[in-house]
């Protein structure tokens, strides 16, 4: 289920899974020039990994 769900004009972060077991998510942010950056990740028994 949803663990994190944040959304505003400059930043968005969504995370799903089971806290303490396995989660996956993504976040998006904008720099001062309006460029968008997106990162998808997973965190589980193997550690935190960017996809």
Curated annotation (Swiss-Prot):
* Pfam families hit by this protein: Chitin_bind_4 (PF00379)
Q: Which InterPro entries match?
A: Insect_cuticle
Assigned keywords, A-Z: Cuticle
According to its UniProt record, in which tissues is this protein expressed? Calcified shell.
| Keyword match NADP | no
Recall the GO molecular function terms of this protein's record: structural constituent of cuticle
Q: Which residues form the Chitin-binding type R&R domain?
A: 1-51
Would you tell me the protein name for this molecule? Cuticle protein CP575
Q: Could you tell me which species this protein originates from?
A: Cancer pagurus
What lineage does the source organism belong to?
Answer: Eukaryota, Metazoa, Ecdysozoa, Arthropoda, Crustacea
């Amino acid at each position: 289920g949803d663990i994190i769900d944040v959304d505003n004009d400059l930043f968005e972060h969504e995370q799903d899974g089971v806290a303490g077991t396995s989660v996956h998510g993504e976040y998006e942010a904008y720099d001062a020039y309006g460029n968008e950056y997106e990162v998808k990740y997973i965190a589980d028994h193997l550690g935190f990994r960017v996809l």
